[in-house]
Amino acid sequence: MSFYSHIARPAFFSLPPEKSQHLAEILLRQSLLWKATSKLFSFEDEVLHTELAGLKLRNPIGLAAGFDKDIQFLSSMEQLGFGYVIGGTITKEPRSGNPSPRLLRIRKEKSLINSMGFPGEGLQAAAKRLENLPVDPSAIRIVSISGTTIDDMVTCQTTIQTLCSAIEVNISSPNTAGLRIFQEQTHLLKLLEALNQNKKVPIFVKLPPFIDSQDKSMTTEIRDLIEACLKSEVDAITVANTIPVEDTRLAVGKGGLSGSKLFENTLSMINTIKSEYGTKIEVNACGGVSTGEQAYQLIQAGANSIQLYTSLVYEGPGLVKDIKTDLAKLLKSQ
């Protein structure tokens, strides 16, 4: 990570956020480069082996949705040593997303605020890229889907599910108009009923956050969503999406906060859910993780897997290996 922190990151951060993101994507699309350097990021230990919704993982560290929105470099991300990778979020039709500026850095807090609004090339382009990915029987590839109607969600599911290991249903982006309809229990139940009729692979549901500094309790709305997931036999929930914030520097005036500032909230949410629901549902922890110690705390709290995004931007491609190395030591010492 020294090269990244002293050379690569300053170069990326000298550019506006979206321009540096585009540059990173160009580099990540060089799949042969990442395959050739994969040994630099390799760390395997049986103590990290686990299962998630029946899927056998080499380790519990996953790439969160949003990093590779259009399935352009998932095979490169797999070379970094993730236990699984999530592509998307994919929508049925192409979307331009929200107007710019729509991505901000908060360097002191190693955080980001985004109001992207699901920009992407749409379902058919993503499906074609999934079909063309190198065959790897050990790879766990998950796809995040979203939409504002049940029909759109089902179309995404039925098109994608034969090409991936599981589907994560995003009902919780704070940046997409119309999506909040599925944050109502009745509508979520109808959505999950429709998805279950066509289900061939595990389904995860990505929930909105429910804890802030003023209220350390689960809200009625979130409890209703979890109950809907349990009733519909969802295979796992992802806790949680970005925290909604307002910021006048964004064109739309609001967005979602991600990064290190979220870790304590994430840990509190996992503790709260597990204390109430125990082993009734599997949980992916997402938000603020950048160290093996933090991953260990979440696993001890009951998380089945850990998802990374913003910490990769700040710490670089060696982060996954560092987290796994420290996590393995902690698991062996318990």
Locate predicted features.
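N-terminal capping/small domains of soluble enzymes
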Residues: 1-141, 330
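Glycine/Thr-rich beta-alpha phosphate-binding loop at enzyme active sites
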Residues: 29-30, 34-43, 112-115, 174-187, ...
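Short beta-strand/loop segments at the ligand-binding rim of alpha/beta enzyme cores
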Residues: 54-62, 136-143, 198-211, 273-285
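Generic structural signal for well-ordered alpha-helices
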Residues: 74, 123, 127-131, 153-161, ...
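C-terminal helical cap(s) of enzyme catalytic domains, especially alpha/beta-barrels
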Residues: 94-110, 246-259, 310-334
